[in-house]
Amino acid sequence: MKDLLKFYSLSEINYRHKYPLIQKIKYFAKGILLYFVLQICALLLMFLVDEFLIKKMGFPSVFKLMLESQKKIKGYYGFFLVVILGPLVEELIFRLILVPKRRNIAIFTFVFSFLIMNKTYYLIEIDWLLLMSLAVSGLLSLLVFNLLKRKPEIETAIGKRQKMITMVSVVLFGLLHIANIENLHWELALLYPVYALPQMISGYICSVQRLKLGFVWGLLFHSMINLMAFLN
């Protein structure tokens, strides 16, 4: 237990440390166990807020609204978005940059700027907006890569703030999922972060796995969690 808590803390980050494959699998499996333990605590808190605050204030159950939103995603395309494409895009945005290398920052710039301009990662049709978004995003990422190549001190400065960037990433990742709740009421704005705790927990575990095991492991964990939610 002590070894598990030590591994899943941010006290010691050394993404250059190479773990044997068997050790990686063990830490990955323990991460799933840790996730479910923390999720039980988060769900209990969400239930208490739902019953004793949300309903008392005269609003419908936020927890039920979240479940209804999840049920609307179905079929093979829904599976592709939830289990494959969604986790890949979110990991590229929120986790890749946690190891602040030029290549990673450039890829982050490309994906982030593309989403800002195209407004979604769903590729419904090839049109001028899509092509322009790809061109501008590619140009921006190339400029960022060349800038970091000429000024490596920027990369170093970002690396010194790795823990802070990780925690900010975890919080933003969780808060982003508040948008999945149907019929948002701004009167409940201070309570909605409670319902983002499950995503913050998964985001934290993904972040640690990305930093200590590698990008692929964080992506695999993310996809597995989404798969279980999709099948449920």
Regions found by a protein language model. Name each.
Residues 16-24, 66-74, 158-159:
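Helix-boundary and loop/linker segments of multi-pass membrane transporters
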Residues 18, 65-66, 70, 148, ...:
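N-proximal short alpha-helices
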Residues 53-75:
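Perimembrane loop-to-helix junctions flanking transmembrane segments
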Residues 68-88:
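Interfacial helix-start motif at the membrane-water boundary
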Residues 82-88, 92-232:
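Transmembrane helix-loop-helix hairpins at the membrane interface
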